[in-house]
Amino acid sequence: MGLFKKNPFGHILFIKKWLIRILGVITHRRFRGFNELQIDGSEVLKNLPDTNVLFISNHQTYFADVVAMFHVFNASLSGRDDSIKNVGYLWNPKLNLYYVAAKETMKAGLLPKILAYVGSVSIERTWRAEGQDVNRQVKMSDISNIGK
């Protein structure tokens, strides 16, 4: 039973955990070797509540920011101070980390679909769709999904 436990979005946690581990090992070198990720203030993350915390990312570097946040949050929560040395922190990743993303973007290819499974709260853009400007009403279900 525990093997098939799901999150509020219907994703199987066992699969999510393994995706985080695999993607983490693949991307660790980017943030640890190729680009040296500068971390400051990881002690703040340890003192945050378990629910209702929202971090905002710059859209232009979105996927890199999301992956970096997964690395930093998991490293910090497993006792590392301002460091992602030794990728062992991914063995038991925090599974209730989510980020807000455009539904259209998260369906655009294999990598976005995998990242969506790992933790996207997908919403519909109200100002743009498929490269065209639009004017949509905000979907209240999108807003309520953020609070799940």
Model-derived regions, located:
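A transmembrane-helix-recognition feature enriched in membrane-embedded lipid enzymes
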Residues: 1-40, 68, 109-117
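Soluble catalytic domains of membrane acyltransferases
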Residues: 33-148
